[in-house]
């Protein structure tokens, strides 16, 4: 019914129905889709906007401030009481008029500082609402860096550098609205130490370590001392901080997150 009010071509509506009822293959097994649609499907965001356009109009008619991305929506009110009242009134509209089911587990009343939305969290500064990266998003980012800089993943240096650069560019561009200079500064220092540890393990033999340290500009006796050290990779990564400098790591292709963030913000 909602689709028919927006889309006048019956053939298109028929095609959409066929798509929704086509089923999915999960782990090699066909499963029927009787409710909803496959997550991540190319039609999902388009249908979300068609279906929820009615919700947008209703919220505007009621004078609410809100933000919506696909089916993820936040409605802003001045007090907890008015928020609870709005929630109580809007759910019947969504379920009764749009025939959509509201996920009660994900629907909540909370202060904006306690909310996670599209990976962001929010805080107030000088009377304005500011963005920061949510702690869960930070944890996911660090887990990805751990994966890319794992000393035992068997990845070639060229492939690791390429994947690391791709991840940094994508992640920073997504979260560029957030205030995160300090976060990225600390993350860069931690990531560079992990990268140094990767190279130290790759050098393996004492003579290889000595040769590489000399190539980095270390004098004979110091290079010999470090090459013979029995300290672990993580400890040695800290010792190598000055000789295996940040500039060298950047030249290898490991783009600093903070530097890229500042460039993105300027543009």
Which positions does each model-derived feature cover?
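Conserved polymerase palm-domain catalytic core
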Residues: 1-114
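Catalytic cores of large soluble enzymes that bind and process phosphate-bearing ligands
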Residues: 8, 43, 47, 82, ...
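Alpha-helix initiation and N-capping motif
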Residues: 9-13, 87, 138, 142, ...
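Extended C-terminal regions of large enzymes
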Residues: 199, 203-267
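Short, conserved aromatic-histidine micro-motifs
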Residues: 63-69, 141-150, 201-203
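Non-catalytic, peripheral interaction segments enriched in hydrophobic/basic residues
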Residues: 160-206, 210-214
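A conserved non-catalytic segment of reverse transcriptases
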Residues: 21, 92, 97-162, 166-169
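Short hinge/gating elements
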Residues: 33-38, 150-151, 174
